[in-house]
């Protein structure tokens, strides 16, 4: 997982007088799930459109699998997940994928294989209009990976999904990655990124403010806390042996005590506070 499949240097993009990205540098290693994190308007979707050739940058350099993002040489090697607007509601699950098999000029024998990967094989004859939201989302994934891409671009893959459907999507992403697919995803869900991503980059106001392994970032920017509950109050204190000892000496009845693990959300809040 040491070869970079995405290399970005000094990437910049503006829309009239609005700066969307400015001087962004990052790389994505082969075989990893890389998360681009930030609030709405941070520049995440703009970044993914630049990486996939849907937009042209104002400055900087992008290399995708050693090529420019709009190169025809890499078209068959990447998958881009979009919303369900491309699904044909009055056609069957199988026929929806048959259309994409024809677009990529691949044998239709791959359809049942990819349906099995996303657990939709038993629904292949159903109309898309009859599918649940979760099943539609899995069909979108099937459409995205039908040509067996080595690199996936996913823009907010679980946004606006209920918890059960979002979990289904995360499991598919992890399963694809376990088979060797590199994944670049954008999300504002810090917990989701912590669960799935090997590395993350925090984006704020068009700038990358920090990047690294989630555990390393939490260790660097967050402090563990202790939650204590007594008969009178429920509160937290920093994980400090001396402070903890002092607290315990003054407590008559301790009902509960446990450590609170740091989160990526805390890291982001710390970083943005330092930036301001």
Regions found by a protein language model. Give the residues of each.
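Catalytic Walker B motif of ABC-type/P-loop ATPase nucleotide-binding domains
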Residues: 152-156
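Conserved ABC ATPase "signature" region
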Residues: 98, 102, 108-124
């Amino acid at each position: 997982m040491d070869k970079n499949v995405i290399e970005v240097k000094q990437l910049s993009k503006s829309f009239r007088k609005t700066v969307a990205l400015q001087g962004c540098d990052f790389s994505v290693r082969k075989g990893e799930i890389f998360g681009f994190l930030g609030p709405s308007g941070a520049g995440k979707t703009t970044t993914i459109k630049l990486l996939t050739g849907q937009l042209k940058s104002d400055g900087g350099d992008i290399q995708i699998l050693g090529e420019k993002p709009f190169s025809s040489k890499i078209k068959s090697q990447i998958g881009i997940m979009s919303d369900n607007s491309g699904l044909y509601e009055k056609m069957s699950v199988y026929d929806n994928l048959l259309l994409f098999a024809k677009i990529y000029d691949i044998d239709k024998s791959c359809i049942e294989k990819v349906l099995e990967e996303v657990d939709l094989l038993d629904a292949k004859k159903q109309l898309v209009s009859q599918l649940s939201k979760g099943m539609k989302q899995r069909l979108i994934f099937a459409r995205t990976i039908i040509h067996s891409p080595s690199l996936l671009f996913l823009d907010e893959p679980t946004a606006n999904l209920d918890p059960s459907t979002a979990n289904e999507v995360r499991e598919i992403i992890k399963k694809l990655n376990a088979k060797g697919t590199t994944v670049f995803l954008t999300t504002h869900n810090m917990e989701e990124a912590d669960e799935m991503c090997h590395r993350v980059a925090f984006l704020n106001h068009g700038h990358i403010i920090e990047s690294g392994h989630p555990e390393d970032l939490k260790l660097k920017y967050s402090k563990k806390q202790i939650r204590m509950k007594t008969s009178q109050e429920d509160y937290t204190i920093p994980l400090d042996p001396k402070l903890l000892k002092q607290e315990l000496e003054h407590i008559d009845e301790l009902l509960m005590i446990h450590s609170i693990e740091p989160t990526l959300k805390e890291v982001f809040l710390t970083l943005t506070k330092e930036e301001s």
